[in-house]
């Protein structure tokens, strides 16, 4: 197995938030929807079933923790969670905060409107809140 490397598209479309025991947590560069990616730091993964049993359990725990942190930070009305991988095959899980008044509601977020940059102070505050919420995860 080769060493872990983050897919260049995932790296370019997101910013680092923190590392959990298994996954790197990243914030998508799209203020239309507060949106996290969890990327397990293991090489050659495409599907959740490519993880061993213990790592599958850990990933689910991290999805739950990231979902809770995002919901608390944004006070969203709904969370969308999924591992699609149609554009980027490297295993990554989307955790998206949704609001009834967002531009894509109630449909999926992909391709509805162009990505919108965060105001720097808003992104910094959100990342700080998420880091604080995820700081003590083992």
Could you tell me what each predicted segment is?
Residues 1-138:
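HIT superfamily nucleotide-processing domains
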